[in-house]
Amino acid sequence: MDKTKMFSAINLGVGGIFVLSGFIKLFSFSFVNALLALFIIVFGLGTIGLEKEIPPIAIKYGSFMFSFLGRGFFYAFMGTLLFSYSGFTSFLGFLVLLAGIAYCGANYVAGLQDYAPRSMRDNDWDDNVDEV
C-alpha cells in the first residue's frame, strides 16, 4: 500500500472513530456527556472533511492539523478524552491515542513528510494564508 494512502486511511479511520464514539456517548442520558459527544462528532466530521477538501478557514485557524506533530497531539488529546469513558469507547480512545503517539513520532522520521497526504502538507497551502 502506498504510504500516502495509508496516512489518509488512518486519518479517515480516526475521524470515523470520533464520529462513532460520539454517537455512542450521545445517548448516555447525561447533559455533560451529550455535550462532549457533540464536540467529538464535530471534530470527527472535521477530520474526515479535511481529507476531502480543505477550506481556507481551516488553514487559518486549524494549521496544527497540517503537520504530523500537530495532528499527533490533537489525536492524543482526543484519545485521552475518549479513553476516559468506559467499555468499547475506551478501547477506541486507546487506538486514537496510539495513532497520536505514532504521528508525533513520525514527525521526527527523516523523509516521512514527503509521504504525508495532501491534507497534511502545510507548505501546499501557504498561498491561502493571510499575513497577520
Curated annotation (Swiss-Prot):
It comes from the Eukaryota. Keywords: Golgi apparatus, Membrane, Transmembrane, Transmembrane helix. One of its GO terms (cellular component) is COPI-coated vesicle. Residues 1-3, 47-56, 113-132 are cytoplasmic. Its main location: Golgi. Pfam families: COPI_assoc. Residues 25, 78-89 are lumenal. It is a multi-pass membrane protein. The keyword Membrane applies. It is found in: Golgi apparatus membrane. The chain crosses the membrane at residues 4-24, 26-46, 57-77, 90-112. GO terms for biological process: vesicle-mediated transport. Belongs to the TVP15 family. Golgi membrane protein involved in vesicular trafficking. This is Golgi apparatus membrane protein tvp15. It comes from Schizosaccharomyces pombe (strain 972 / ATCC 24843) (Fission yeast).
